[in-house]
Swiss-Prot record:
Function, in words: Acts a an auxiliary subunit of the sensory mechanoelectrical transduction (MET) channel in hair cells. Plays a role in regulating hair cell MET channel localization and function.
Keywords in alphabetical order: Calcium, Magnesium, Metal-binding, Repeat
Domain EF-hand as annotated: residue spans: 66-101, 103-138, 144-179
Keyword Cell division recorded: no
Misc note: The binding of either calcium or magnesium significantly increases the structural stability of the protein in comparison to apo-CIB (calcium- and magnesium-free form).
GO molecular function, one term: magnesium ion binding
Binding of Ca(2+) 2, residues: D157, D159, D161, R163, D168
Any Pfam family hit: EF-hand_7
Binding, Ca(2+) 1: D116, N118, D120, Y122, D127
Protein name: Calcium and integrin-binding family member 3
Amino acid sequence: MGNKQTVFTHEQLEAYQDCTFFTRKEIMRLFYRYQDLAPQLVPLDYTTCPDVKVPYELIGSMPELKDNPFRQRIAQVFSEDGDGHMTLDNFLDMFSVMSEMAPRDLKAYYAFKIYDFNNDDYICAWDLEQTVTKLTRGGLSAEEVSLVCEKVLDEADGDHDGRLSLEDFQNMILRAPDFLSTFHIRI
């Protein structure tokens, strides 16, 4: 009795529940996953809101991400500085957006950010080339990649400006019934 370690205050747990799609139990499970990545760095007591970031090298090596060709972009998009190093809040946000409970429009927004490699708020031909190359793990020739990108732009570029806006991307995602089932990470 009395030996129970307090990881979060009641208010912290409520706040995490309010801004994620997780239960208290899932939040605790994710905290321990985060802590296990860097036990020497991440304290078991978060009641004082420590300023801790787990390096990308550890985030990218997690079983949920290590085989994903977009692991670096995912980490960059969810990290506050864009460097892939994650605070606990970033880590919970990433898992929340990638959870099965997250709505399609939220997933589409983050997928768009992940595929926008040059961070200009559009997916241009270069961004598409990076995306196709990662998806095929370099298995297509430059000509084949270019052809795929051209077809995507022909199909999805609603205003014909040679790039995809978030709205263009969301309209394209609406026509992809398997998007929700593929854009997730199980916890």
